Amino acid sequence: MTMVVCGDFEPEKILDEIKKRLIKKENQGEIKRIYPQKEKEINMPYKESKMEVSMPAFMVGYKDVQGEEYNPRIAVKKHIAIEILLNMIIGKSSNLYKELYEKGIILSEPGLDYEFTYQYAHILISGQSNNPQEIQKRIKETVKTFRENGLNEQHFDRIRKKVYGDYAIEYNSVGNIARMFLADNMKGINSFDYIDDYKTVTKQYVEEILKDIFKEENMVLSIVK
């Protein structure tokens, strides 16, 4: 069990109250979970569902496979690199997003996320559009250009600072701190590692992650319309 308490309080008093309410049980020892081996290949590249929606919703995904030995520090560094890449590819300040928005292909800034645990990991780009296939096509083209030509130094530095700022802002909210610490703890991560590891994320490392994960054979498109 994990408990996170954030706010203006005296730690000693909170700990005393928690201890009063804990039920004493014998130590059952460490629980070792055995998970099935995940396939590296995607299940299906395209899926379409029919629902009553005013505008088609889409999700473009990239499958990432965790190594046999999950390393929290490596996961943190990779997470930062992917956040930078997603913002460079189709974030609000990217050329691709501006073009898609001006042409009315995408309605608003897409959701960008990288979800990972001990067993699985994937990248998600989500939003609403009357032409999700065109968005997927343009993402492929942008990724291909980045892979072939490398990342623009100035663009990379600007987005890198933006991502760091996003992390720092999280600490302005007590609720965000609690959510962040709880989620990271379940992955074996110290939330402060993000601030420390940010300094080690170089343009070269981000380009390696781009080539390793953003592959067309790992890409899927799901549409609800």
At which residue positions do the language-model features occur?
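An aromatic/glycine/proline-enriched structural segment found at the starts
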Residues: 2-68
